[in-house]
């Protein structure tokens, strides 16, 4: 057995060798044309793994799949060191049952030796950007989902040997940021006793009128947090003096720009505090403003023009994004010379490329799907390979309470924040929040059941896993933590014991496959199935360590230790704690 291989890789390699041996007697067949793959048996009674090789390749083989399967079984049955049983199921499936001795040896060299995760042959330098919420307010629930999944993806990729930088892009430039400053200024003037007006505005209302009459813009921010920020700015002696001076001089626009900077500073402090509470740390916070200040936004135009992907239309500079699947070509420089948001994004990704990343991954919100083709096209026009840039869309989150959706609205001020959610879930907010957000694939909407999340029984999937870990810890406290590899090898293998061994041995490949697919939800799916296998083992009478003979106890304890390691490491990857003691362990 080669170190750094998963059990699935070992079985697949053995199958490939057996197929090559089989078709060596078929000179008219080219082995390179074959599809050879294995999957987990859909029904455990048939085995641990299965392959439909004979069915999928019957035309190429020009032979009956039943006959091919039977011949393949004969070859595979010779590997008695690896397989306990290999058999055939019509109309052409070959099923594999891994031998107990092989499982035990594999577990010893992986889960019980600390070599949990196989490493990739070629480690990559990866940039993983996620959350990147506008600094115009607290982080919302969609950002929380991106945070949990992005952080878990980074952990998975690092676990298998990649070098990963986690990055947060700060959108601190542009009109929306200015409107944030205007919104804060309106609240400051109100707090100073200046009567504002409730006059309705539109997107076309001149900013001079909005500032002169102290009107909250139509696209402004109405949340209570804006009032809190305004109040805190007035309590700062230096800032208050600046505010007073600029108000007296009626330099409202200059003051609004300052308020935008100050408000963003406050919001970033809040956002980072929320992320810290959620166990998410970034390697880099990258400011969009720095790109503009370094003239990197307009200068990237030279690269795009060199690629021949820019044309002029009505005084505007337009990127040929339709060549990359976009529904229309996109303006990157307006007729007044101002860059669009797209050009800033292109400049940002050029900066990533120049930092030498082999792979660039972005996690975006649910309303950005149409943006992928234009940015991907721009990245390709800069000479970066299409396959090295990937955008993952984090779909919408629906909070459910008593089966009903809880509404969210950002600008109206009645939305649920990441901080609100963690607080609502109480002392277990971080663990429960992170786990629930990772439970479903990012490309599907998530119904976040608040009632289930608050439930501290084992109906809650987080507590189900944590109780399993705590049970094992309590077992060791009761009978001691001594184990024996030799005692495990001579244990009688009941169905529950053998099933648990296979689920333990699957841990490295589940993590390896989840990391390569960048699908964190596969980890939670595996852990739930694993915990069920452990619970069946735990409840079986012949697995009660305190009632067993010393030799049996030492063998069972070895299995429990491996199970404990799987639970602890699996939970750690998704940022969830593995407590040794909980109020309910039995």
Swiss-Prot record:
Record keywords: Aminoacyl-tRNA synthetase, ATP-binding, Cytoplasm, Ligase, Nucleotide-binding, Protein biosynthesis
Family matches, as SUPFAM superfamilies: Anticodon-binding domain of a subclass of class I aminoacyl-tRNA synthetases, Arginyl-tRNA synthetase (ArgRS), N-terminal 'additional' domain, Nucleotidylyl transferase
Entries under InterPro entries matching the protein: Arg-tRNA-ligase, Arg-tRNA-synth_N, Arg-tRNA-synth_N_sf, ArgRS_core, DALR_anticod-bd, Rossmann-like_a/b/a_fold, tRNAsynth_Ia_anticodon-bd
A GO molecular-function annotation: ATP binding
Subcellular location: Cytoplasm
Entry's EC annotation: 6.1.1.19
Reaction(s) the record says it catalyses: tRNA(Arg) + L-arginine + ATP = L-arginyl-tRNA(Arg) + AMP + diphosphate
Gene Ontology CC: one annotated term: cytoplasm
PANTHER family per the UniProt record, alphabetical: ARGININE--TRNA LIGASE, CYTOPLASMIC (PTHR11956:SF5), ARGINYL-TRNA SYNTHETASE (PTHR11956)
UniProt-recorded name of the protein: Arginine--tRNA ligase
Biological source species: Leptospira interrogans serogroup Icterohaemorrhagiae serovar Lai (strain 56601)
Encoding gene per record: argS
